[in-house]
Amino acid sequence: MLEQMGKQAKDAAFILAQLTTAEKNCALSIIAEQLEQQAPLILAENAKDIELAKQNGLSDALIDRLLLTQERLQGIANDVRHVISLADPVGKIIDGGTLDSGLKIERVRTPLGVIGTIYEARPNVTIDVASLCLKTGNAVILRGGKETQFSNKILIEVVQNALEQAGLPKFAVQAITDPNRELVMQLLKLDRYVDMIIPRGGSGLHELCKQHSTIPVIVGGVGVCHTFVEKSADQNKAIFVIDNAKTQRPSTCNTLETLLVQHSIAEEFLPKLVSHLSAKNVKYHAKSTALNILKQAGANVCEVTEKELRKEWGSLDLNVVVVEDIHAAIEHIRQYGTQHSESILTSSQSLARQFINQVDAAAVYVNASTRFTDGGQFGLGAEVAVSTQKLHARGPMGLEALTSYKWVCEGEYTVRK
């Protein structure tokens, strides 16, 4: 099954690589239109996934990731149209020149080929990844979690029908809809056809891919994100940043998980924060000093464990740690962070610069919410993933991250001396 799927994807990728930008945009436009026209059918299938998720006792955070609404579906269609508006990186000359030998040489962006994406309870990823891959001339094999089987099946049908309407091979976008985990293992070994594996999910999924894949893997997505409130920060403004970073959409990987507060302002700042977040149902997990302050402020708080400091909650749980100074904050991030998104709230330019220089993360923020780590927010369009590694791509992966390059060399029957 997967051998055939891989061959079909490879053949489709050859065709996609030859397409003009206009041809790719035409296909994307039809996909966006079909998402809107088929919305009742898509939402009906998604409702089946939601019902099964509730029956199986999945968490509210997972169900939120799984849920499609009319508004979210319209947002997905709009994201596809935004990808249309983005510059096509394929064929772009990165650099070049003429050598002493007279050989003209250029480095030109090209598609990667076939992308394999493994993800969990996020049906929106199906369209996000498909649209980015199509724009960059890549074929894609998608494997969503068993929680999304009904949603993914109908979304793939919509996309494949749109591709055929555009005169393109429907096998440019394929999905493994069988929930058998053995098929994931087979996909990870399909290096004859697949050029890159992009996992989107928890740490367990990323470890599985790293350990078993014979194909290059993009590692990332797990976000134990920190925000450090330094003593010179504007406390009233800082509270709103923390509120946004923690409560706007807790299930995302760019959500704040651990709040670090400088010791000298903790007794003043933390009660203000608790009061502000009182209606948000935030549950705090704190150490020693922070634990006592939060208890006195009437917060719903318990003692944090070492394991929880490394945990991506994906919920309204928030770790709180009081640190002595910026050095202690940076050391805590070094020990517990996942190199995703880290933020400092401060009025000191020198401390902000120190934080930027010393914190190793895909995205580092000064006086801003970590929630901005997103392809759309960064102006990249829908993202295929957020990479926390350093090779090939880092941070939100938009169009350019789905390309490679080739050296194009032109001569006048030139030979090397």
Curated annotation (Swiss-Prot):
SUPFAM superfamilies: ALDH-like (SSF53720). The keyword Amino-acid biosynthesis applies. It comes from the Bacteria. Gene3D superfamilies: Aldehyde Dehydrogenase, Chain A, domain 1 (3.40.605.10), Aldehyde Dehydrogenase, Chain A, domain 2 (3.40.309.10). It catalyses: L-glutamate 5-semialdehyde + phosphate + NADP(+) = L-glutamyl 5-phosphate + NADPH + H(+). Pathway: Amino-acid biosynthesis; L-proline biosynthesis; L-glutamate 5-semialdehyde from L-glutamate: step 2/2. One of its GO terms (biological process) is L-proline biosynthetic process. Catalyzes the NADPH-dependent reduction of L-glutamate 5-phosphate into L-glutamate 5-semialdehyde and phosphate. The product spontaneously undergoes cyclization to form 1-pyrroline-5-carboxylate. This is Gamma-glutamyl phosphate reductase. It comes from Haemophilus influenzae (strain ATCC 51907 / DSM 11121 / KW20 / Rd). The lineage of its organism: Bacteria, Pseudomonadati, Pseudomonadota, Gammaproteobacteria, Pasteurellales.
